[in-house]
Amino acid sequence: YEAFSHIIDSMFNQHAKWLDASKTEVSWRAPISSENILLSSTVWRQDHNGFSHQEPGFLDIVVNKSPEIVRIYLPPDANCLLSTIDHCLMSTDYVNVIVADKQRHLQYLDMDEAVKHCTKGIGIWDWASTDDSADEADVVMASCGDVPTKEALAAVAILREEFPSLKVRFVNVVDLTRLMPAEDHPHGLTDVEFNALFTADRPVVFNFHGYPWLIHKLTYRRTNQERIHVRGYKEKGNINTPLELTIKNQADRFNLVIDVIDRLPGLGAKGAHCREHMKNRIIENIRYAYEHGVDRDEIANWQWPY
C-alpha cells in the first residue's frame, strides 16, 4: 500500500546508505540484487478507503538518497510497467521504487513502444501532440503517473476539440529522476535535452502523481522555471470517485484545460467561454458523483478519441 510505505522509511534509509557505502567505498563486496519496492493501492484510487490511504510522499523521501543508488519509476500503462519491472529485476545495487495502480487502466503503447519509452525514461508522445517540426508548441502538457496521464490526455483531447489550431506538445515521464540536472544524477537531463522536450520558454502544465512541489524541487534550476505549473495531490480527499478526487486536487482534465487557458491569453474570448464551460463540467460531475457514488459512464469509460 502506497500510503503505508512510510512504515519502512527508516529501513529504506539505512539500506540505501549501506548500499551507497558498499558500492562506492568497498571494492571487494560483490553486487547484490536490487531492492524493488512496488507501491500500489495508490493515492488516486481510494474509492472505499478514503483520506487515510492517500499519501504519495514516499517519493519525497526516496529522492533525497544518493543518486548512485535510488531510481523512481511511474509507468503510465501495463506495458510500461512490464518493461520497468523487467529492467528492475535484472539490476543490481539499486533501490528501485515503482508506482503502479492495481486497478484497470487504459493501454497507450504497444510492447515495442513501451520498451523504447521506458528505456528513454521520458519522451514526447507524437500521437497525443499537435505541434510539429514547422510550428513550435504553444503549450506543453506533461504527465507522470497512470491516473495523471489519463487526465492529462483527456485535457489534451478537450483542447483539440475546443481550439483546433492550438499547438500542444505532450510529454510523459516514466523515470522521475530524468527531470534532475545531469550533473546531479546519472539519469538527469542536460539543459539542452530538457529544453528540447519542454521548450525553453513555453508554458508547461505538469500533472504529477505525488505532491506537486517535488517537481518544482527537481526542476528549480531549469530555464524559466517559473513557467512550469504543477498539479498533483494536495491533501484534499475522502471516499471519492476517481474523477471527484482529481477535481478536489485540481488534477482533473477540466482544471488542466483551465490551467492552459489561463497561461495563453491569446485565446481571448473563446478561451474565456471555454473556461466557463469547464467550470460547469466540474460542477456537473461533482454533483453526479455525490448523487450516484460513481463517475459518469463517459468519464469511467473514456478512451483516447484521436
Regions found by a protein language model. Give the residues of each.
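Active-site nucleophile and cofactor-binding loops and adjacent substrate-binding regions
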Residues: 1-7, 30, 39-41, 73-76
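Thiamine diphosphate
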Residues: 24-35, 39-60, 67, 84, ...
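Long, structured ligand/cofactor-binding scaffold of large enzymes
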Residues: 1-23
